[in-house]
Amino acid sequence: DVVPTLEATVLPATQAGKMTKKTNYKKYSNTSIGWGVSMHADHTTPGGNVPKGVSLKKYQAYYVGNTKEKVMYLTFDCGYEGGYTRKILKTLKKENLKAIFFVTKPFIEENPKLVKKMKKEGHLVGNHTCTHPQLSKCNVAKIRKEINDCAKTMKKLTGYNMDAFIRPPEGVYSLRALKVIKDMGYKTILWSIAYYDYDPQNQPSVDYVVNKFKTYYHKGAIPLLHIVSKADCEALPKIIRLMHS
């Protein structure tokens, strides 16, 4: 499944939050699916954990971008601030690159100036919910509340509308959750490159991170990076140089 170009020309999330039609969501499976990919060292598009016969695209959910071009879509999950965000933003600005930052409500509340900086510097800021729950374990009303309250907090504290992209917490989804998200006007963005980077107390080496990209990069890659990762922060300039080579 190919993501449309990740531009900020999407419906602002504050408008997207209104459901457009009444849907019987009970028709959609609520079985929990943990997102994962089988990365390929031959640089071909990885396979993802999608139920047989299901098209993610039908739900406006994507895990790769344009697979015909040598492009990569940088995405960062922002659960809380670890002291590396400004340096990451500085690197992106220096390289004239844009990313998507998926923010939780607590991240916005604790770092409104950082979120404003992301928007001012041309990045997309997407939704990562209020309390970071597995959405397959939430009823429809709870999913809506998790998403809408996060978007409202961003508008209130930064003055900016949230861009209508979402990353499901922990990468756990269900077809029902994807349908609710789609009906709210959001695109679900998963990932095609990932590794263990989210524990600040157990960080990989910079060489390990760079080697992951060197080994598994593919056209249209959407890597999952974490804002609390010292390794990601320090590896980012090397990753960018690698992609330009």
Predicted regions, residues:
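Active-site beta->alpha N-cap acidic-glycine motif
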Residues: G36-C138, K142, E146-K156, Y160-D163, ...
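Alpha-helical scaffold elements lining the catalytic groove of polysaccharide deacetylases
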Residues: Y84-K87, P133-T158, V172-K219, D232-A235
